[in-house]
Amino acid sequence: MTKEEKIKFFDDAAASRDARRARSRYYHRELLSFFHFVIPKNSSVLEIGSGTGGLLAELKSAKALGLDFSPAMTTAAKTAHPAFNFMIADIEALEITEKFDYVVMQDLLGNLDDIWLSFRNLSRVTTPETRVIITTYNPLWEPLVMLAGAAGLKGRDLRQNWLAIA
């Protein structure tokens, strides 16, 4: 799938994103609890792949920036959370150089074309003290996730790239 096709996929999903997340609220509530545990209030936080901005708004950070390569997701985030900053940006072609205490990549890795390039680009927004928090679901959940999708409890996702253990 090309980058343009991925952007279109997420642009098309932007309008229903929050309703879709509400259907899997247990998963997202657990993630939010984890993020509250590891990210102190008043930290500076960069969320890459911020979607409609719900997580960033919940973290109550002193400085927060959300990046997403989908213009429609970014517009939805700005509309829903006007007190926060959101930008259209791609981690694989990152241009910002502002440094953050925490960088969050929630359920993003599998959607990246070049994971290693993305990791290299993180050096532009991190210091040696920055904590990078990456979440992804365990592939052991795949049968249940597929069943939930077939039952209409989960929306369609892109095919994920997986990292090999070598």
Ranges and model annotations:
Residues M1-P40, N42-G51, I133-G155:
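Conserved class I S-adenosyl-L-methionine
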Residues G51-A93:
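Class I SAM-dependent methyltransferase SAM/SAH-binding core
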Residues V104:
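A conserved beta-strand element that flanks and buttresses the S-adenosyl-L-methionine
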Residues D107-L108:
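Short catalytic micro-motifs in class I SAM-dependent methyltransferases
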Residues W116-R131:
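A short glycine-rich, Lys/Arg-flanked "PGG" loop and its adjoining helix->strand segment in the class I
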Residues A150-A166:
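Acceptor-substrate binding/catalytic loop of class I
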